[in-house]
């Protein structure tokens, strides 16, 4: 999960266009994600909430993606990894997601419901 903040010197329309229009296809093409959920934060619920403009949820299939850049990016070899990383760095920098970002590793577990049979 990543918490994004829009750079103060970038207007909202440009930021959203670069994030949704330009970055999204790059993120999908260069990483081994099977889910990419973009949540745009329109307002804070409490007065003293920190500024967060977006919450991104990404799901990576192999546990190896936690410790291996090759697995994280779905790279076939070192050259492919380098290319994918360069694309991501350029793409995130274009809308300010290369600075002032919080990344929170999480896990997802599916439990059976005691109320429904599978």
What is each stretch, according to the model?
Residues 1-118:
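Macromolecular interaction modules
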